[in-house]
Amino acid sequence: METTLILGSNSFSGATFADFVLALGGHVVGTSRSAEPNNAFLPYKWHDNKNFTFHELDLNKHLKELMELIQDIKPAYVVNFAAQSMVGESWQNPSDWFMTNAVSTIKFHDELRKYDSLKRYVHVSTPEVYGSCSGFVGENFAFNPSTPYAVSRATADMSLRTFYTAYNFPVVTTRAANVYGPGQQLYRIIPRTILFILLGRKLQLHGGGVSTRSFIHMKDVCDATWKVMTDGNNGETYHISTDEVISIRSLVERICLKLNVAFDDHVEFVGDRIGKDSAYHLDSKKIRAKLGWEDKTSLEQGLDECISWVKSNFEILKQQPFDYQHKP
């Protein structure tokens, strides 16, 4: 099978997609700006995968080395999960978010477009570019970003539109909301809630937890990403989401119920974060109709898997940072 290059392979999404491709018999090369983290956060390390190699490369500092790697391994597919994430924190050092998500990413695109052997470039974007919305949002919905993070991501997205038009660059874009699953970073709501309950710590619930989201298991996102990568149409965007909508409070209540604890004993309410979108729900009819994709993992099943993962790795996880660690 052809080689797939995954940028941001240390990320939850990137590591899980690497594991997905390897399970299909593919060859995967991963890059991230930091050394590989603990194996508990790397699903591709949970199986005997021999077709994965890792290179520590920073998109902001090692563009030349990254392009040399591409020329050496000649991947048919490049999937980019690499980005400065964390919406709230982007207000504190916005230039860092713009450097990674806009400037360095666009520089990479400008080099990658000159690579002749590329079959498909998958740009993993975010629904944050739409801002707060009512109802279900389709792929052609206008951008209305409300945070530095969202603006930085929208910048690269719009740049890619011009690259497709001007150069026929073989790009497809995905937006998924909201991903979760075993191996996710501990500052995300689901693993954080589970871990804090098991540790007897109080979870801070911003804005009372009234904001609503859809949660989709990363296994389903991997399946969708694979279909987009292999069968999608260049220049198009595909939304990956479920139709189930739940408030953050209800999500935490559901986890408390599964762990047999009282919600009020483990939660404290704090003010909302600046620029936080109250809701964005993605319409995924397109990928279902055009590529035959469907989500298969219910939230109930997915939460059980996450609880099992936290319990199985509890001694390791309780020693890890619980909060996002910013790195310029």
Predicted regions: what is each one?
Residues 1-179, 305, 313, 322, ...:
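N-terminal Rossmann-like NAD(P)+-binding domain of SDR-like oxidoreductases, especially those catalyzing
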Residues 65-73, 111, 196, 224, ...:
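CheY-like receiver
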Residues 94, 174, 186-187, 232:
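Active-site loop immediately N-terminal to the catalytic Tyr-X3-Lys motif
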Residues 18, 23, 30-31, 197-328:
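C-terminal substrate-binding subdomain of Rossmann-fold SDR/epimerase-dehydratase oxidoreductases
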Residues 186-194:
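A glycine/serine/threonine-rich, flexible loop-to-helix segment
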Residues 122, 132-134, 168, 184, ...:
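Proline-centered turn/helix-capping motifs that create local helix->coil transitions or kinks
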Residues 155, 159-163, 193, 251, ...:
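Hydrophobic alpha-helix immediately C-terminal to the catalytic Tyr-X-X-X-Lys motif of short-chain
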